[in-house]
Amino acid sequence: MKHITSITTTTLLAAAALAQSTAPAASPIAFDLSAGYDSEYIYRGLWFSNQNAWYNIGASKKLSDSTTLSTLAYYTSSNDRRSLYQELDLGVALAYDAGFATLSAGYTYFFFFNGYLGGGLGQTYAQEVYVSAAKTVGPVNATATIAHDFYVDASYAELALDKSFGITESTSLVLAAKAGYSLGGYYTLFDGATGLNVGSESVWTHVLLQASLPIAISKTATFTPYVAYNISGAGREESNAAAEAANLGGEEDQFFFGASFKAVF
């Protein structure tokens, strides 16, 4: 789920810069392939599983100097037999360089092979629409996102900040922070018997702090290790603590790490 709507501001603003250049008469379709590992799969502050391997394929096409259409398919699977968690996401988005900011709108379909919470608990699918705005504010990049989930009829708002520091010609350090907020019970409380969302409150979900180290291996390939720390808000404390109590791997406040490889062509 996270790779659909948690695009970093750096990526969005880079796309905007490219959009300002003159587009060719027939813009080609650009593809990217990614694969990675997460020690913990945490999405929007909620712990899902651990020891996850994931794969992503994306495609994008410039429709005009200022507009880009993109699609992607993302799959993640836990290698821990306690959760047996698997997820497939399919998404489409349209980004527009409005000058003052990069504006995006998208749709995502989520399929949960063994239930939203794994182990057969929870719904098997969800779908959402979202809008976001990305802009450089002073020394940092900022992205504001709001998404509405049709399955639970609740929304999620997020503010993300990131700053990149060049280390060498091929390596940079990216420091990022995110804060999420549930609007109307966005997966804030679950029925213990069915795993279905029964939350209704509007509360903070989490704060996420992350440091990543993108390393350019070539002009088209990048390797990125990262470390992160998730701090549960009121909308995540009970669920994440329950995963910890069940000895599944989740914690209220949790350190995790991972790495990914990405190639574009």
Question: Model regions: which residues?
Answer:
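Flexible, solvent-exposed coil segments and beta strand-coil junctions
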Residues: 34-38, 67-73, 135-143, 189-194
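Outer-envelope beta-barrel architecture signal
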Residues: 25-33, 51-53, 65-69, 88, ...
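Cleavable N-terminal export/targeting peptides
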Residues: 1-30, 66
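Short stretches within intrinsically disordered, low-complexity N-terminal or propeptide regions
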Residues: 16-19, 135, 223
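Mid-chain, structured segments of secreted extracytoplasmic proteins
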Residues: 74-106
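Outer-membrane beta-barrel translocator/channel fold
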Residues: 75-83, 106-129, 138, 145-156, ...
